[in-house]
From Swiss-Prot:
Gene: cbc
Entry function: Required for endonucleolytic cleavage during polyadenylation-dependent pre-mRNA 3'-end formation.
Alphabetical UniProt keywords: ATP-binding, mRNA processing, Nucleotide-binding, Nucleus
Origin superkingdom: Eukaryota
GO molecular function: ATP binding; polynucleotide 5'-hydroxyl-kinase activity
PANTHER family: CLEAVAGE/POLYADENYLATION FACTOR IA SUBUNIT CLP1P, POLYRIBONUCLEOTIDE 5'-HYDROXYL-KINASE CLP1
Protein name (Swiss-Prot/TrEMBL): Protein CLP1 homolog
Organism: Drosophila yakuba
Length: 423
């Protein structure tokens, strides 16, 4: 294929063009020549050119047939007629039925959870269902419980946003005014008790916020989950389903999980087994780590289309109110009377700055003091420790906002690290 002139691909009805870009600095341009096509539920505009870069794994689907013009260097590119999109649109139709009933009776709309192991396309299915909902005039909420990657905020947090318009083809959903809660670990296993507490709090606030707008109330919530589905991971899924009052659970590509949920969730919950798309690519541990890093980098620096210019400034140790949620475990014999070992998992403890703090991402909490409900308080944003100077008793912070930190700023430690080598 010539990189300069590109190639036209003719797709029949109910088929999709899939391509992947793995090479650094590679750029692929796509335009819809004729017909109708969509990317994960967002309609492509005819003759408009869309640009994709390194790491893109794209599947452009057509219900009626179309011609696409593609130019640039791809590692994989093919047309597939084997696609689960018809099943996915049926799920949307079922949710829409629930929404119409909720609208008539002035009730909360459906809460649908998407579950499955890693790399089966959970985030993509969420995006498709949200886009379809918006295209028929709904305003659903999107809750992301995947602390390993984070599609709304960065990894190590859970977050919710209101979806008012379809996702941008190249950049995804607008991340305007997200509700973000700090967890501080890359997996729920980092602190299972804290994870459940944070999920419960966000579910409570999210369900309450459905009442703020009639259209949102009947539109409901789409919930994305972690890829840990065995043992304690499965227990977290059951906890989330209960906390959100899920009425539908879409299980991607795992019959065992489907049957376990059929057995364990209340009878009124619809559990549906769905195939994953053949275009879903399994990611190595290194690729997942790179994706996490890229999300943090974009948080501070934006991207080529919309660059950000963060600030670096110094904060003295004496002005740094830094805490961590979760104290080291103690034997029961050492615990104060009436306190359980699990209580330590949600205890807020002060962190003394040391060189070990360098590169760690910190969350800026809206809580004003540790006496406040820190776990149940959302965060304003994130900063990163780029230097620790023990002689001068100061740290250097990378922040989206200029100095100083807000008065009484309370920072929360995270195990996430970011090497700021941006040039």
């Amino acid at each position: 294929m010539s990189e300069d002139h590109g190639k036209d691909y003719t797709l029949e009805a109910d088929s999709e063009l899939r391509f992947e870009i793995e090479q650094k600095d590679a750029k692929v341009l796509v335009s819809l020549v004729s017909g109708f096509a969509e990317l994960f539920g967002t309609e492509l505009v005819k003759k408009k050119q869309y640009e994709f870069g390194m790491g893109a794994k794209v599947a452009i689907f057509t219900y009626q047939g179309c011609v696409l013009h593609v130019s640039g260097k791809m590692d994989v590119c093919y047309i597939s007629k084997e696609t689960p999109m018809v099943q996915y649109v049926n799920c949307h139709a079922a949710l829409e039925q629930f929404r119409m009933e909720a609208e008539e009776k002035d009730r909360h709309g459906p809460v649908a959870m998407v579950v499955g192991p890693m790399d089966v396309g959970k985030s993509t299915l969420c995006r498709i269902l949200l886009n379809y909902a918006v295209r028929v005039g709904r305003r659903p909420l999107y809750a992301d419980l995947d602390v390993g990657q984070g599609s709304i905020a960065i990894a190590g947090s859970v977050a919710t946003i209101l979806i008012e318009r379809p996702a941008n083809v190249e950049e995804g959903f607008a991340k305007t005014a997200p509700l973000v809660y700090h967890f501080g670990h890359k997996s729920p296993s980092g602190n299972s008790i804290l994870y459940n507490a944070v999920v419960s709090k966000m579910a409570e606030v999210t369900l309450h916020s459905l009442n703020s707008n009639k259209r949102t109330k009947s539109s409901g919530i789409i919930v994305n989950t972690c890829g840990w589905v065995k043992g304690s991971g499965y227990a977290h899924l059951l906890h989330a389903a209960k906390a959100y009052g899920a009425c539908a659970i879409f299980v991607l590509d795992q019959e065992r999980l489907y049957n376990e949920l059929l057995r364990d969730v209340p009878k009124g919950v619809h559990v549906v087994l769905l195939p994953k798309s053949g275009g879903v690519v399994e990611r190595s541990k290194e690729l997942r780590h790179e994706a996490r890093d890229q999300r943090i980098k974009e948080y501070f620096y934006g991207n080529a289309r919309a660059p950000f210019y963060p600030f670096s400034f110094e904060v003295k140790f004496q002005d740094l109110r830094l805490y961590k949620i979760g104290a080291p475990p103690l034997p029961d014999s050492c615990m104060p009377i009436g306190m359980k070992a699990e209580d330590n998992k949600t205890k807020v403890v002060a962190v003394t700055p040391t060189p070990a703090l360098i590169h760690h991402v910190l969350a800026l909490s809206f809580a004003e003091s540790v006496e406040d409900e820190v776990i149940g308080t959302n965060v304003a944003g994130f900063c990163c420790v780029t230097e620790v100077d023990m002689e001068r008793q100061a740290v250097m912070l990378l922040s989206p906002q200029p100095r100083p930190l807000p008065p009484n700023a309370l920072l929360l430690w995270s195990e996430l690290q970011f090497m700021d080598n941006h040039t």
